Amino acid sequence: MKIAIGYHLQEGPWGGGNQFAQSLAAALRDHGHQVCFGLRERDIDLILLTEVRGRSPSASFHAGTVLRYLQFCNPRAVVVHRINECDERKGTRHMNRLLRRANYVADHSVFVGSWLRALPLWRRGAASVI
């Protein structure tokens, strides 16, 4: 299986998202999967959307890029949206809107906590809490 992780790996200390992406990529490769960090390849089986802020230096793609990929390259790719952020967590006023929009391209949502899943923001499609 070919899996695209929406994260630009960073060298050195960069935070939890970077550690998550590095660990996930290593585990997937150990299990025989191919891992890429962009949407240039036409035969991606699974897209992991990890960052909704398009201008973030850690984002290798965002929801708009995923939507274009599904429309013009590979409509069979499955999209999983990893959600670990919200306005309530940091007192911001923009993340919920970005997350809600991005969530529309997802076939499945993975929440890092049940408290995130309980917020009235998400499509009520397939979801998991880790």
PLM regions and their residue ranges:
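Active-site phosphate/pyrophosphate- and oxyanion-stabilizing loops and adjacent acidic/basic residues
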Residues: Q22, A26, R100, A118
